[in-house]
A protein has these predicted regions:
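Short, basic, low-complexity termini and linkers enriched in Ser/Thr/Gly/Pro
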Residues: 3, 13-17, 95-100, 629-639
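Ser/Thr-rich low-complexity repeats and stalk/linker segments
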Residues: 25, 31-108, 374-376
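Surface beta-strand/loop "capping" patches
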Residues: 30, 39-42, 296-300, 321, ...
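Aromatic-lined ligand-binding clefts that engage carbohydrates, nucleic acids, or primary amines
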Residues: 47, 279, 309-337, 366-368
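Beta-strand-rich ligand-recognition modules
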Residues: 62-85, 97, 333-386
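C-terminal beta-sandwich/jelly-roll accessory domains of carbohydrate-active enzymes
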Residues: 64, 592, 596-670
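An acidic-aromatic loop/edge-strand motif
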Residues: 102-171, 202-288, 363-446
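Catalytic cores of secreted or luminal carbohydrate-active enzymes
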Residues: 245-284, 522-585, 600-602
Length: 670
């Protein structure tokens, strides 16, 4: 009886084992999909998982390669170096008749670029469309492919694969690029124009994230143990889940209470015939309208603003675009009582389409319901505030011709006041190692041609360790890819002055006296690291920023400067990048700077010198085109710096091709 039971058990075990083998699948990472681009000129790793000991065959370009999966089920085949070309088919298959194969079609071989960092990499083609309308309308190149890594985090350790994504090796056209990185799109376009080979653009970024999130634990363990100690709090999954749920519920209840307590909703303050004569008249540039009458501090809650505009018969009924600059931090906007748009966070430009028939001859009313979650509701200066008509109404470069400018005067009434809104999550993406673990590590060893790193805004509050972090990032990523020659182009922070953002009146005020600038400190750290690394270049964009907008629109020019860096690093083109100081000496009453290239001659601004006390003073400077002479009457000058401001609008050292010189600080040699 016992023998019979044992035989039955063995039989069931064998059957289950057979089913397991029959159901087993060979897998490849989600980065491997039809339409992918693989790197020319290097061995091409193809890898994945299978049953331990299973033979996996990879077929590509009329050749077949075999490998046996290890004890952990991992397998890898390195395809030989290939020239650019395609399309090809990549097939991956396990052993056995029942093994399901993987067939990937339309595979190209060309150049693959990884772009990583924070929100300025994220800025989409949709956002910059008004800056480059004609060029974006013409986007169409099936040999440029776009891949967007889905955001994810992991506090415990590295992952083998990424999450599914909606932009997975899509061919470049306006529709596919609309929600894709503008820098990535323009970089692919530029590099294709230079090389005429397929381009693969992998974007792996997350807005607002610090560099520490992109570093592996091993790189932090020795020098920054406090960061890993901080991470340990978030390794408690039960805490993270409970806190996230509590925060989400609190934010949801806050929004519900806000709406229920706002008299403007039930009172229909957006209605065209609503009587606003008793409301207070305010200028959008006078921040007094945003102050609470009870606390005297910026309002948390809602503020309603109404502006009456006159529309003549020629424009009545026509479709238009309402440009409301940028508002902090949320808004719901109405025209003649109809909602025409809303934006639920502070950064996007407000561009709302007005349908045909909504504008009427005579008086029209624009109503804005400001929602301020954290205090400081305001308009951003130096942005367009207008109604635009005509076929060019989508464009800001050049500006549309047929417009009705909005006035700066509004009627204002306080809606409701609230306590500050609780956060909706605990932002695991801002914790050390979490992005390296979840979205960077799984990409290796996918063969790359180069990396673009565009980040730093979130580290500007504490720039001191940034240079070390950046060196560790480049070193650890090169180790991960087993390629110590992997090229990096670091995009330096653009000029930006957050002090001006909080509703200052236009025009922007210039910083003219020497200041301590964390922004410049971080820019200088980026400059210093790039200078010291023979496989890195710096894209200087200190002339492409916007004083009050941390997300400037000129992303095509950013991509072009990144491309110049790669031309020098990879293709050995002797292109000139931004001017660099290669020597300095103290002459009679001046400091003489020798540069690596000629520059535009004339009077120069942005230089400061300091003596023994370390206090900086403005210094006049000029150039004859080959050297810079900085005037110095100081007896014991010790150091010199350039463009040391958040927004150094007057700094004007440029190459003959117009590229700006980087922020720098040097000790003066006597």
């Amino acid at each position: 009886m016992k023998i019979r039971k044992m035989k039955k058990f063995v039989y069931l075990f064998v059957c289950l084992l057979c089913v397991s083998i029959a159901d087993a699948k060979v897998t490849v990472p989600r980065l491997f999909q039809s339409g992918m681009v693989m790197q020319r000129g290097k061995p091409i790793p193809v890898w994945g998982k299978a049953d331990a000991g299973e033979t996996v065959t990879v077929s590509f370009n009329k050749k077949t390669y075999s490998v046996v999966a290890g004890a952990d089920g991992r397998w890898r085949v390195d395809l030989p170096v290939m020239k650019a070309g395609g399309p090809y088919t990549l097939e991956v298959k396990g052993e056995g008749a029942n093994s399901e194969g993987i067939v990937l079609d339309d595979v190209l071989v060309g150049d693959v670029w990884l772009l990583s960092g924070q929100s300025n990499i994220d800025v989409t083609i949709e956002r910059v469309y008004p800056q480059y309308t004609k060029e974006i309308d013409g986007l169409d190149n099936p040999r440029i492919r776009l891949f967007r890594v889905q955001n994810d985090t992991d506090t415990h350790g590295v992952r083998d694969d990424i999450k599914p994504t909606s932009i997975n090796w899509k061919p470049l056209n306006k529709q596919n690029a609309w929600l894709f990185s503008a820098v990535g799109t323009f970089l692919g376009k530029r590099m294709f124009e230079k090389t005429h080979v397929p381009q693969g653009i992998i974007v792996n970024s997350w807005g607002g994230t610090p560099i520490e999130a992109w570093l592996p634990a091993d790189s932090l363990r020795k020098d920054y143990p406090q960061l890993l100690k901080r991470l340990s709090i978030y390794q408690n999954d039960a805490y993270v889940k409970a806190q996230g749920q509590a925060n989400g519920l609190a934010a949801q209840q806050w929004q519900q209470m806000l709406d229920e307590s706002d008299p403007g909703i039930n009172g229909q303050w957006a209605a065209t015939d609503f009587d606003d004569t008793a409301w207070t008249s305010v200028s959008q540039w006078d921040n007094g309208w945003a102050l609470s009458p009870t606390t005297g501090r910026p309002v948390v809650g809602t503020v309603w603003l109404r502006q009456h505009i006159h529309v003549d018969k020629a424009h009545a009924g026509k479709p238009a675009r309402l440009l409301l600059g940028t508002l902090f931090d949320q808004d719901i906007t109405y025209l003649n009582g109809c909602e025409v748009g809303h934006t639920y966070y502070q950064y996007p430009p407000r561009r709302y389409d007005i349908p045909e028939g909504l504008l009427r001859e005579g008086d029209n009313v624009i109503t804005v319901r400001f929602i301020s979650k954290y205090g400081k509701p305001h308009f951003l200066p130096e942005k367009p505030y207008m109604l635009a008509f005509g076929d060019d109404r989508m464009s800001l470069n050049p500006m549309p011709q047929d417009v009705i400018q909005l006035g700066e005067q509004w009627k204002m009434h306080l809606g409701t006041e609230m306590p500050s809104c609780p956060g909706t999550d605990i932002s695991l993406q801002n914790q050390p190692t979490t992005l390296y673990n979840a979205v960077l590590h799984p990409l290796a060893p996918y063969a790359l041609n180069g990396v673009v790193w565009y980040q730093g805004e979130s580290n500007s509050g504490n720039p001191a360790p940034y240079a070390d972090y950046l060196r560790k990032l480049m070193g650890s990523w090169r180790t991960l890819w087993n390629d110590q020659q992997l090229p990096f182009v670091i995009v330096q922070l653009a000029n930006y002055d957050g002090r001006q953002q909080n509703g200052s009146p236009s025009p922007i005020t210039l910083q003219t006296t020497p200041v301590n600038s964390n922004w410049a400190c971080l820019q200088e750290a980026q400059h210093r690291v790039a200078q010291a690394d023979p496989r890195a270049e710096l894209a200087v964009i200190n002339d492409l920023g916007e004083t009050v907008d941390i997300h400037p629109l000129r992303k095509k020019e950013v991509a072009e400067r990144v491309a110049l860096g790669f031309e020098r690093l990879i293709y050995n083109n002797k292109v000139k990048l931004s001017p660099e100081v290669i020597a300095s000496e103290v002459g009679e009453g001046k400091i003489i700077l020798t540069l690596d290239q000629p520059i535009q001659a004339g009077e120069l601004y942005g230089f400061e010198i300091a003596g023994d006390d370390g206090k900086y003073h403005n210094a006049a400077a000029s150039s004859d085109g080959s050297r810079i002479n900085v005037q110095c009457s100081m007896f014991n000058v010790q150091s010199l710096r350039y463009a040391w401001k958040d927004n150094p609008l007057r700094a004007n050292v440029r190459s003959l091709t117009g590229l700006p010189m980087s922020v720098f600080e040097i000790k003066v040699k006597k």
